Amino acid sequence: MQNRSFYVKSYGCQMNVYDSQKITSILESKGLKNKLDPKSADLVIFNTCNIREKAAHKLYSDIGRVNKLGLKKTIAVVGCVAQAENSEMFRKNKSIDIVLGPQSYHLLPKMLDDLENNFKQINTDFIVNEKFDYLSEQMRPQGVSSMVTIQEGCDKFCSFCVVPYTRGPEYSRPIKSISDEVKLLSQKGAKEIVFLGQNVNAYNDKSNNNDAKLSDLIRAISEFDSVKRIRYTTSHPINMDEKLIQEHKII
């Protein structure tokens, strides 16, 4: 995989931006070079969003633009459109080589290796707990304000929303995993931490006999002297409990 290069295009929400940053860190740790232009990259990754109805149409248009460059590229579609359309993507556009759901992007290096056997690669399993184990020490600094995913998925199944089908059921990262990431980010200059989740205030870490809610996580992260501000998005009113409200006054 050495001497290869990649380009990542992100669509949609802040969590996709965060996921693209993690994909970039993982690939760079494997020796790939990040490019700012698809023309100069061997691998083009589209990290997709499926909230809006025309999201897939925009994706296929962008793939068409890459194909018009006339250069052989490995094309990977990751994220929520990949999860929603699954193997159907290969039928719709034969230039797609990899289809990867939003809970499996840590498998991308292995899929690239397997692709050398000339088999198209797909993984849309909901294995969200595994991907957070791949916290690269070479994580790229995000700047003064840094995003950290603490929760994914949703159990609400609102009639207008596709999130439970593309991001899966609610899952909360262990506090230790989040703390380790915040520590790395703070060492790289982060002063503000933005917690991300599809239903962020449904956060509930039950690992290792814990029962930690978002209020407990905020309290734990506030102990980092270098972290001056904590924000979170997106919240749901049904999970806005009194303890969390009081934490806004205390911290």
Segments (PLM) and residue ranges:
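Proteins enriched for Cys/Gly/acidic motifs involved in redox and nucleic-acid/cofactor modification
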Residues: 1-203, 213, 243
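Conserved AdoMet/S-adenosylmethionine-binding subsite of the radical SAM
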Residues: 54-62, 205-251
